[in-house]
């Protein structure tokens, strides 16, 4: 006769895999065309000069140069640009 009740099941114990979002190249860093600058959900950062935007809102460099972050416009939006070196 068992003197302890059998362990029950639980509904916890799951979590989704992290998506590795965020800034990949910071202001002042040199980049090559095609380098990913920011991975994001939605447009937390907007594409500035010499920047492309993917269907998942990833920002990437269209030309070689240095990364530049700036806040501009009436809504204080964050823009990322590539400035020629």
UniProtKB/Swiss-Prot annotation:
GO terms for molecular function: structural constituent of ribosome. Belongs to the bacterial ribosomal protein bL27 family. InterPro entries: Ribosomal_bL27, Ribosomal_bL27_CS. This is Large ribosomal subunit protein bL27. Transmembrane segments: none annotated. Residues 1-24 are annotated as: Disordered. One of its GO terms (biological process) is translation. GO terms for cellular component: cytosolic large ribosomal subunit. It holds the Pfam family Ribosomal_L27. Keywords: Ribonucleoprotein, Ribosomal protein. It comes from the Bacteria. It comes from Pseudoalteromonas atlantica (strain T6c / ATCC BAA-1087).
